[in-house]
């Protein structure tokens, strides 16, 4: 057998080319399949420039501050759809203004929606009896943690809900939900 001169030998063989093509295709498919998974765990922020999501009422309509305050008296705690569609309490302060924080209504024990009991002035979970004070701090188990907080902002009369990442003012700890 005669040996070919170095200038006649191709730099990449057919097998090497097919291996690179197969690897490139598999990598593209894997990255394409991982995008929805990554987007699920790290969703893009929805909403305006403040990064907030517009609160929605039980019919899915955007909540406005003037409309909400005209129908809800001081001290009222009523549910809206907040972050990720979770039920979130909007609190009407004594000075006829919407409070600067909201309370996520999902119980930290087993995920039931916790109703506000105005007679007892606390949230009482119907599933296993966990109780939370007026600010959502756990006062009686079996729930291990306080209810999650959200920021409430008013922008051009729209009520915006955004993630609470600062220290939890009720406990002085880092927020467990952030």
From Swiss-Prot:
Cofactor comment: Binds 1 [2Fe-2S] cluster per subunit.
UniProt xrefs under PROSITE patterns: RIESKE, TAT
Quaternary structure, from the entry: The 4 large subunits of the cytochrome b6-f complex are cytochrome b6, subunit IV (17 kDa polypeptide, PetD), cytochrome f and the Rieske protein, while the 4 small subunits are PetG, PetL, PetM and PetN. The complex functions as a dimer.
Subcellular location: Cellular thylakoid membrane
EC numbers for this chain: 7.1.1.6
Top EC category: translocase
Molecular function terms from GO: 2 iron, 2 sulfur cluster binding; electron transporter, transferring electrons within cytochrome b6/f complex of photosystem II activity; metal ion binding; monooxygenase activity; oxidoreductase activity, acting on paired donors, with incorporation or reduction of molecular oxygen; plastoquinol--plastocyanin reductase activity
GO biological process, one term: photosynthesis
PANTHER family to which the protein is assigned, alphabetical: CYTOCHROME B-C1 COMPLEX SUBUNIT RIESKE, MITOCHONDRIAL
Species this chain originates from: Prochlorococcus marinus (strain SARG / CCMP1375 / SS120)
InterPro entries: Cyt_b6_f_Rieske, Rieske_2Fe-2S, Rieske_2Fe-2S_sf, Rieske_Fe-S_prot, Rieske_Fe-S_prot_C, TAT_signal
Occurrences of domain Rieske (ranges): 71-161
Required co-factors: [2Fe-2S] cluster
UniProt similarity note: Belongs to the Rieske iron-sulfur protein family.
Disulfide-bond pairs as recorded: 112-127
Chain residues that bind [2Fe-2S] cluster: 107, 109, 125, 128
UniProt protein name: Cytochrome b6-f complex iron-sulfur subunit
Note: The Rieske iron-sulfur protein is a high potential 2Fe-2S protein.
Cross-referenced Pfam families: Rieske, TM_PetC
Record bears the keyword ATP-binding: no
UniProt GO cellular component terms: plasma membrane-derived thylakoid membrane
Biological function: Component of the cytochrome b6-f complex, which mediates electron transfer between photosystem II (PSII) and photosystem I (PSI), cyclic electron flow around PSI, and state transitions.
Catalytic activity, as annotated: 2 oxidized [plastocyanin] + a plastoquinol + 2 H(+)(in) = 2 reduced [plastocyanin] + a plastoquinone + 4 H(+)(out)
């Amino acid at each position: 057998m005669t040996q070919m001169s170095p200038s006649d030998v191709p730099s990449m063989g057919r097998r090497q080319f097919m291996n690179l093509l197969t690897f490139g295709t598999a990598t593209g498919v894997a990255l394409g399949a991982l995008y929805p998974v990554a987007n699920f765990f790290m969703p893009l922020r929805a909403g305006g420039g403040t990064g907030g999501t517009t609160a929605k009422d039980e019919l899915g309509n955007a909540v406005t501050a003037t409309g909400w305050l005209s129908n809800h008296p001081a001290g009222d705690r009523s549910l809206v759809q907040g972050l990720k569609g979770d039920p979130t309490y909007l609190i009407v302060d004594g000075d006829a203004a919407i409070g600067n924080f909201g309370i996520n209504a999902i119980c930290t024990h087993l995920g039931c929606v916790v109703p506000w009991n105005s007679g007892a002035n606390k949230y009482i979970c119907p599933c296993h009896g966990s109780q939370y004070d007026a600010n959502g701090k756990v006062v009686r188990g079996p729930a291990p943690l306080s209810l999650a907080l959200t920021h409430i902002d008013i922008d051009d009369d729209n009520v915006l809900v955004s993630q609470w990442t600062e220290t939890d003012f009720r406990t002085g700890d880092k927020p467990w939900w952030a």
